[in-house]
Amino acid sequence: MHFSDQDRFFMESAMELAKESFLKDEVPVGAVVVKENKIIGSGRNTVIADNDVSSHAEINALRSASKELNNFRLNGCSIYVTLEPCHMCAKAIVDARLDMLVFAAKEPKTGSICSIDNFLENKALNHSVKYKFGLSEDISANLLKDFFKQKR
């Protein structure tokens, strides 16, 4: 897949947020929402800190972007995430009407884009989101491996 210099920049921004999560003892996932080549929202996993199962990086980034635009619809936006979204996050991405999803590493246990499901390919969805993956995949996968190695 082709990735632009802008894609690399935005994924690196998401990766920095994932590293913050790692340091805060949260699963290291980060996400940024971009509109017109500007980051308008960012988030990292805060499930433990918030005692909230929905506080995934993607959800936090969508909330941040929605506040910035004062609109829950994020048409014309893209989201960069360090890990393949789960079903909850994939549905939120569709409902927010994002144009593009770029993610780094596949998530073989819960990834709903191309690992356990092809959620975005579902013709019944009322909005279509393009996606591509693999940018900084090794960096994300290694960060996750290191995190879970610490836990054992």
List each model region and its residues.
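Short beta-strand scaffold segments in enzyme catalytic cores
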Residues: 29-37
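Small-residue (primarily alanine) positions within well-ordered alpha-helices
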Residues: 14, 18-21, 31, 41, ...
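Short, basic and Ser/Thr-rich N-terminal targeting/leader segments
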Residues: 25-29, 75
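Zinc-dependent deaminase
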Residues: 1-24, 72, 85-152
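Short beta->alpha transition motifs characteristic of CBS
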Residues: 40-47
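Residues that line or immediately flank small-molecule/substrate-binding pockets and catalytic motifs
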Residues: 47, 81, 105
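Helix-adjacent hinge/juxtasegments
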Residues: 51-55, 59-92
